[in-house]
Amino acid sequence: MSAPRETIAAVATAQGRGGVGIVRISGPLASVAAKAISGRELKPRFAHYGPFFSDNQQVLDEGLALYFPGPNSFTGEDVLELQGHGGPIVLDMLLKRCLELGCRLARPGEFSERAFLNDKLDLAQAEAIADLIEASSAQAARNALRSLQGAFSQRVHNLTEQLIGLRIYVEAAIDFPEEEIDFLADGHVLSMLDKVRNELSTVLREAGQGALLRDGMTVVIAGRPNAGKSSLLNALAGREAAIVTEIAGTTRDILREHIHIDGMPLHVVDTAGLRDTDDHVEKIGVERALKAIGEADRVLLVVDATAPEAADPFALWPEFLETRPDPAKVTLIRNKADLTGEPIALEVSDDGHVTISLSAKSAGEGLDLLRDHLKACMGYEQTSESSFSARRRHLEALRHASDALEHGRAQLTLAGAGELLAEDLRQAQQSLGEITGAFSSDDLLGRIFSSFCIGK
């Protein structure tokens, strides 16, 4: 696979003024541009300081010129970088000079796209470049760097290699029936299949954690009217984002607030109080609240610790558990601890349920416990050298692969259908290939790289 032969150019540094600005060129005309702009032959992979010339030999700027002949460059093509002063006018003049020499303006992400097309990066590594640039916390940046260095891709590659080995064994048995391999009696296929499924499950769990660090966690605040949901939102946001009154049902619609906790992005959603009501508008708000609960990464179920219902909070709204079937993603918040006198604390039950006693109003007592808990849910303390950045599309691909393997196992154990297992293995391999770009449509590639910065 090779990239187009046009030569592209773009400003690679951020818009605005700065001490240094970089113009990047990639393609067959890079060597021509290097000599025309610097006025001399450039030694590959050396930094040359000097003037940058226009077509009539006027000096446009001065700085460093670096020439990287392909394939030993970022894109795999001939690459020229001009590092001058970071003023927008100077950079525009340099870019205009590149266009005069036959270059065209690069599309967003086109340099990374060419690196992918020339096998310098796989798709997950290319996406990690954008993730590293956009990282909103040190942990997210570390994860993105590990993905750029190939940590995620290597995990996917290992899974793919195991699937290929399994496919070879299964398809050989199908193609050569005279060997009379009994899949079930053999036990080899089932053992290999379960090994891949277990490893895939681990990668999917770690990818989910990486996606939370990259995209941010959606936290929905739910509970009865007047439990203190809006007060909790305001306390987390550090401002009066929601109206707070003593009137039950003040919040009737979804209210979203984007906050950061030590650089970790959270999308906090305040919802209407859960109760039966004849008010048409409030009823719509309750329906939207239940929908938001079902889509949340984490639910904070707020109860008024002074109310009798606090003794059995999960019984206060039956539809709640139906909407949020995974209790492990629900944190119980016992609010108004300043009124009950109960200690500010975080407790974990034997079954793993987390309860935090706090006061959303009284100087935010207990908020630090909640913030630390939310950071832990996002993997803030995760220091594993194997952690990596992941995107939602990666999670979908991993889930599709997992579903295919589950289906294939059922075909094998319930029906002994080796032919159907072979097809499920093929689908699982294709889903994994979509992560690294081994199997990707042109439309998908276009959407991914168009989201990059120009010059990357």
Curated annotation (Swiss-Prot):
The TrmE-type G domain, residue ranges: 216-379
EC category: hydrolase
NCBIfam families: mnmE_trmE_thdF, PRK05291.1-3, small_GTP
Binding site residues for (6S)-5-formyl-5,6,7,8-tetrahydrofolate: 24, 81, 120, 456
Cofactor: how bound: Binds 1 potassium ion per subunit.
PANTHER family on file: TRNA MODIFICATION GTPASE GTPBP3 (PTHR42714), TRNA MODIFICATION GTPASE GTPBP3, MITOCHONDRIAL (PTHR42714:SF2)
Keywords: Cytoplasm, GTP-binding, Hydrolase, Magnesium, Metal-binding, Nucleotide-binding, Potassium, tRNA processing
Entry protein name: tRNA modification GTPase MnmE
Family stated for the protein in its record: Belongs to the TRAFAC class TrmE-Era-EngA-EngB-Septin-like GTPase superfamily. TrmE GTPase family.
A Pfam family it matches: MMR_HSR1
Residues reported to bind GTP: 226-231, 245-251, 270-273, 335-338
Organism of derivation: Pseudomonas fluorescens (strain Pf0-1)
Residues annotated for K(+) binding in this entry: 226, 245, 247, 250
GO CC field: cytosol
Annotated residues for binding of Mg(2+): 230, 251
Cofactor(s) needed: K(+)
E.C. no: 3.6.-.-
Assembly behavior: Homodimer. Heterotetramer of two MnmE and two MnmG subunits.
Described purpose of this protein according to its UniProt entry: Exhibits a very high intrinsic GTPase hydrolysis rate. Involved in the addition of a carboxymethylaminomethyl (cmnm) group at the wobble position (U34) of certain tRNAs, forming tRNA-cmnm(5)s(2)U34.
Record carries keyword Manganese: no
Subcellular compartments: Cytoplasm
